[in-house]
Regions:
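Amphipathic alpha-helical segments used for helix-helix packing
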Residues: 136-158, 165, 173-176, 201-205
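Short glycine/proline-centered loop/turn elements that form peptide/ligand docking sites
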Residues: 38-39, 43-44, 71-73, 95, ...
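Amphipathic alpha-helical packing segments from all-alpha helical-bundle domains
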Residues: 111, 157-200, 214-229
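Short, basic, alpha-helical segments at the C-terminal edge of helix-turn-helix-like DNA-binding modules
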Residues: 104-111
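N-terminal intrinsically disordered/low-complexity leader segments
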Residues: 1-51, 232-233
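Short hydrophobic clusters on alpha-helical segments that form packing/core surfaces
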Residues: 52, 56-64, 110, 135, ...
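Helix-turn-helix
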Residues: 55, 63-97, 101
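Hydrophobic alpha-helical connector segments
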Residues: 101, 115-141, 195, 217
Length: 233
């Protein structure tokens, strides 16, 4: 028998699907552009709608910091953000979808930190390890929040495909900048993708408590050296 909370959530979800009051989150095309230009959830959204969207994501991030993945509940997000439950579902069909958007925002912040600075290191592998180390240190500073974000990344379904695609594109862009190339070759692109996959799989193990941050960096160091050895970097 469904609980009252389950029934309320179902009604809110169905109501949000039939409502035209709020715009849906943009598709995969141009999502990073919307994020960087402050236009989420869509180019046609009005200022109050964008402000509500940001409040919802911020509420989810705050709850994650306070209690980790399990503390991020749709009703709690609505209450914290001061919006109706249906509005939350209008933007995000699940908390995993919402937290993946939060993860995308965090990693965009990481990318922007290094956008206009000279990254230390004499070789591409040294520069990538520097960026990986600095970014992993950021994650360690608020472990409950970033555990929640990584768990959401693990559990996300097709409803978050636009955010997941944008995340992959962002990682590629960040590492391409790090190795210092404008036009990335196929071999470099494959190397970057391998490093990104190793980083995320190591973070999954960190979230599960199987390895420490030092071990994350040891795994990354080995992967970077092996991958870039054949590229001469």
């Amino acid at each position: 028998v469904p609980s009252p909370d389950d029934t309320e959530a179902t009604v809110a979800r169905l109501t949000s699907m039939s409502s035209a009051e709020e715009p849906l989150t943009a598709g995969r095309d141009g999502l990073l552009s919307l994020l960087r230009n402050g236009q989420l959830p869509s180019r046609g959204a009005k200022a109050p709608q964008r402000e509500r969207y940001q409040r919802i994501v911020a509420a989810a991030m705050e709850l994650a910091s306070e209690g980790g993945y399990d503390a991020v509940q749709m009703r709690a997000i609505a209450d914290r953000a001061g919006v109706a439950l249906g509005t939350v579902y209008r933007y995000f069909p699940s908390k995993n979808h919402m937290l993946v958007m939060g993860l995308l925002m965090v990693f965009e912040g990481m990318r922007s930190r290094f956008e206009d600075v000279a990254i230390p290191g004499d070789t591409p592998s040294e520069r990538i390890l520097f960026v990986l180390r600095k970014n992993t240190e950021v994650l360690e500073k608020d472990r409950p929040r970033y555990e929640a974000l990584v768990r959401a990344f693990m559990f996300a379904d097709a409803s978050a495909s636009a955010e997941l695609d944008a995340f992959g594109a962002l990682m590629t862009e960040m590492f391409a900048k790090t190795i210092g190339v404008e036009q990335i070759s196929d071999d470099q692109l494959n190397a970057i993708r391998v490093i990104g996959d190793v980083w995320m799989s190591s973070l999954v193990s960190w979230v599960a408590g199987r390895i420490s941050v030092d071990e994350v960096m040891a795994h990354l160091g080995l992967a970077v050296r092996l991958v870039f050895r054949r590229l001469g970097g």
